[in-house]
C-alpha cells in the first residue's frame, strides 16, 4: 500500500478498541479511536470525510452503531463502513439495514479483519 488509509475505530469495549487499534496501527493504517458513537460522530464532523473506513460496534450506549452507520452513509457517502458485533442472532440484518459495507461477528481473528479491510479498500482504491 502506497497510500496511508485513515481509519476511525469505534467500540465501547476498551479492550477490544485497544486491540483493534494496536493491530491495525502496526499494519501502517492511520488510526483514530472513539469510545462511543457520539465521540466517533464528532471526529467525523471534525475531519470532514477524511476517513477512508469506519469500523464500528453495532451495540453501544448513546447512539447505536446502526444509527451511526445510517448517519455516515448519508453525510459521508464515500466512507466505507465495517460493522462489528457480538450481539444477536442476526447481526447481518441490522448492519444491512444500516447499509454497512461489511459485517463481522465477534469474536473474530484480527487477520480476518485485515483481509476484509484490504478487500473493501481495493474495491474503492487502486491498491
Regions found by a protein language model. Name each.
Residues 67, 87-104, 115:
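Alpha4 helix (beta4-alpha4-beta5 surface) of REC/receiver domains from two-component response regulators
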Residues 49-55:
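Active-site beta3 strand of CheY-like receiver
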Amino acid at each position: 500500500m502506497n497510500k496511508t488509509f485513515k481509519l476511525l475505530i469505534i467500540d465501547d469495549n476498551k479492550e477490544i478498541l485497544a486491540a483493534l487499534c494496536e493491530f491495525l496501527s502496526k499494519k501502517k493504517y492511520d488510526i483514530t479511536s472513539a469510545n462511543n458513537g457520539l465521540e466517533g460522530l464528532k471526529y467525523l464532523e471534525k475531519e470532514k470525510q477524511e476517513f477512508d473506513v469506519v469500523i464500528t460496534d453495532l451495540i453501544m450506549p448513546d447512539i447505536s452503531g446502526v444509527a451511526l452507520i445510517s448517519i455516515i452513509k448519508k453525510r459521508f457517502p464515500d466512507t466505507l463502513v465495517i460493522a462489528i458485533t457480538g450481539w444477536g442472532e442476526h447481526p447481518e440484518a441490522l448492519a444491512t439495514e444500516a447499509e454497512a459495507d461489511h459485517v463481522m461477528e465477534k469474536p473474530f481473528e484480527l487477520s480476518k479483519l485485515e483481509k476484509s479491510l484490504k478487500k473493501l479498500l481495493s474495491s474503492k482504491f487502486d491498491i
